[in-house]
Each structure stands twice: as structure tokens, then as C-alpha cells.
Amino acid sequence: MMRKMLLAAALSVTAMTAHADYQCSVTPRDDVIVSPQTVQVKGENGNLVITPDGNVMYNGKQYSLNAAQREQAKDYQAELRSTLPWIDEGAKSRVEKARIALDKIIVQEMGESSKMRSRLTKLDAQLKEQMNRIIETRSDGLTFHYKAIDQVRAEGQQLVNQAMGGILQDSINEMGAKAVLKSGGNPLQNVLGSLGGLQSSIQTEWKKQEKDFQQFGKDVCSRVVTLEDSRKALVGNLK
């Protein structure tokens, strides 16, 4: 259950392509480079550059736009400017929320000195580093790297799996040490009982957060679909 919760956190930034039990209908095929001067959408769909006031260059050609087209271009670049930071912040805040909740459970069940806490902190930093590969924050803006999504999904899962191996071993070692110190009873039963209590606490916390992770994935997908529709409409009207 801890693995499931950590994976949901790890993959929340990749929710624009898939999340939980559904597949998003749009898969990003372009990088997006946001700066104060322009928004550039570049990749499999060509090279589109838009200024904040609605000037458009597409595949190296500057286009003369009517008023409606200019508004369309302004709205599209503005939506990109707001959506990418929203995705980045939403994903990272959910990773942080999961870390804090799990850390609290570990402290309650295992104590403040548990090695599991440092593993969790290390994993949190690693996952956020992975997220920065998808949405890279620069001093003058940010860049969305669409090709990084699949790589981050695979490596995020690997990081979680590796961390879970260490966390499980730590929990058994620490509970075993406590069981030996306890007077009376069966040490193995004490360990299994403690593991059961830890699992139950994590399961309860996952149920609290699961709907939020799923809803975030759906919201991201919805925005990505809208952005792609806007891009197609804008490019389709260029003459």
C-alpha cells in the first residue's frame, strides 16, 4: 500500500498521458518553451512561436492575423503560461503531501529515530528531481520536455521499488529489535502484528489521498486536451 501511494505521487506529474485506471486521449508530442517574450511549441507538430500580444510565427513564417486569430493566439499562449506551472506545482505538492503523511505514520508506528524516515526523505528529493526533467524551471521561464515523460515514469517506478526494498528491510529489522526487547510473547508474532498495524495505517491514509490523485490526473488530462484543441484550431486557421 505504501508502494501504491508513493507510485501515485511519483507519477502524478506524468498524469498528462495516463493516470490510474484510464488513459488520456491526448499524448503531448511537442516541447513547450515559455519565456517573457514568447511561447514556443516545438516538436512533431512543427514549430509554433507566439508573443504575448498574439504575433505568430509557424515553421519559420511570420503570419498576418485578423483580430479573431490574434485573440486566439493570445489566449492559447496565456493558457500554456498558466497550465504548466499549475501542473508542476500540483504534482510536487502531492509528492510532498504523501511524504509528510507517510513520515507521520512512520514516527507514530516506528519512532522518530527510524531509518525509514531518511529513506523517505531521499526518495522525495529523487522524485522531485525526476519531475524537473519534465517541467524544467529556468530563471526566465520554464520548459516542458515531452520526451521525458516515459523516461520519468519508468525511472520513478524504479526509484520507488528500490526505496520500498530498503523500507521493508528497515521495518523488519526495527520491529524485530523491538520484539526481542519486549518481555513475553512470541517475537515473530509481535513483528507480524506491528507490520499489520503499519500497513493498516498506510492503507487508511492512501484512501484519504487516492481520490485527490485520481482527480488531479483527470484535471490535467482535461487541460491538455483543451490545449491541443486550441493548438489545432490556431494552426488550422493560418493561411
From Swiss-Prot:
InterPro entries: DUF2884. It holds the Pfam family DUF2884. It comes from the Bacteria. GO terms for biological process: single-species biofilm formation. This is Uncharacterized protein YggN.
